[in-house]
Amino acid sequence: MPSSQAQADLWRHTLYYLTSMGLRCAVKLGIPTAIHNLGGVSSLPDLAAALSIPASKQPFLGRLMRALVTSGVFANGKERLLGGLFRLNPLSRILVEGVVAEEHHSQTSFVLAGTSRHYMEAALGMADWFKKDATGPVPTVFEDVHSASLFDESTAALDPELDALVTEGLAAHDNLGIGTIIREFHDLFKGLVSLTDFCCGDGTTSRAITKAHPHVKFTVLDLPKVIDKTPSDGIVNYFAGDLFHTVPKAQAVMLKLVLHHLSYEDCFKILTQCKDAIPSREEGGKVIVIDIVVAPSLGQVMFKEQTLMDILMLVFTRGRQRSENNWHELFTKAGFSDYKIVKKLGARGVIEVYK
């Protein structure tokens, strides 16, 4: 007979999708924002009233909140979970709508995209995908299930709302933590005259860095469909182009959470273009890569989340999360002479790569 711990582990692995759905429910109801508007802490009756939850459903709301507290989405006071106070914690604070703290935009779109029906259907298609042989480029699981690719026009044709959520959620996710990078990596941009921000959407990252480093001339490079929707702000320059063939020349090029979406071959093409766009190391030239660096040495919890993010890449993109050895191989193949990991910030690493 299996141990009670084995059974509990089985429950967790089999049913943990309910935690994701509970998180989605909390975002759809606006629970983080409601608690924020109530001063950051709320009783169950006050929360139910703020959300206009019928009295008949209040006990069920308490059970949902209990599950979300135990999973770390919210915090509680010393009072009992079902009848006490619920508080925002660092996770739920980044799910508050309409509040920007240290350039941390709300992550609600990221949650809603990641728990959407199309994402769930793609994940359910993994077993069938593994059984199918493929000639030529192997399609992603998402492509196999939906006959559409994320980040291009086919997703908009599949579901315009999903396409908007993915675009907004990716931008919010990728800009998360930029305040920390600016504070802790002041020397990263020190002495730079110009920088091309590669595939950075609406330029949020560049504008944030410009406030701390006004001497740097920023150019945001992205696809025409992205740049065309971005209003000129007079702070950074915007350049619409083919990401695989056009990188505006600058002293540095920054790739923030770009390469993990891409195959080895596409990474090679982009890195080669970036290398050609910068001057030598002696002239201050460098490529700044901010991306996940998979490492068991980060500890079991962080390593587990990195491997989870790698499965996300497997299902939805042609990319992967890479170890330092993988990054070294890529940089060498693209013709760079050297690199250094400046620092690791949780799952992410900040890497300088030299021509």
From Swiss-Prot:
MF terms (GO), sorted A to Z: daphnetin-8-O-methyltransferase activity; O-methyltransferase activity; protein dimerization activity; S-adenosylmethionine-dependent methyltransferase activity
Catalyzed reactions per annotation: 7,8-dihydroxycoumarin + S-adenosyl-L-methionine = 7-hydroxy-8-methoxycoumarin + S-adenosyl-L-homocysteine + H(+)
Highest taxon of source: Eukaryota
Residues noted as binding S-adenosyl-L-homocysteine in the record, renumbered to the chain: D222, D242, K256
Induction info: Induced by cold and photosystem II excitation pressure by high light illumination.
UniProt KW keywords: Methyltransferase, S-adenosyl-L-methionine, Transferase
GO biological process assignments: coumarin metabolic process; methylation; response to cold; response to high light intensity; secondary metabolite biosynthetic process
EC number: 2.1.1.-
InterPro entries: COMT-like, O_MeTrfase_dom, Plant_O-MeTrfase_dimerisation, SAM-dependent_MTases_sf, WH-like_DNA-bd_sf, WH_DNA-bd_sf
Alphabetized Pfam families for the sequence: Dimerisation (PF08100), Methyltransf_2 (PF00891)
Active site residues according to the UniProt entry: H260
SUPFAM superfamilies assigned: S-adenosyl-L-methionine-dependent methyltransferases (SSF53335), Winged helix' DNA-binding domain (SSF46785)
Pathway: Aromatic compound metabolism; Secondary metabolite biosynthesis
Recorded family membership: Belongs to the class I-like SAM-binding methyltransferase superfamily. Cation-independent O-methyltransferase family. COMT subfamily.
Its job: O-methyltransferase involved in the biosynthesis of coumarins natural products such as daphnetin derivatives. Catalyzes specifically the methylation of daphnetin (7,8-dihydroxycoumarin) to produce hydrangetin (7-hydroxy-8-methoxycoumarin). Probably involved in acclimation to low temperature conditions.
Name listed for the protein in its UniProt record: Daphnetin O-methyltransferase 1
Organism name: Secale cereale (Rye)
Gene behind this protein: OMT1
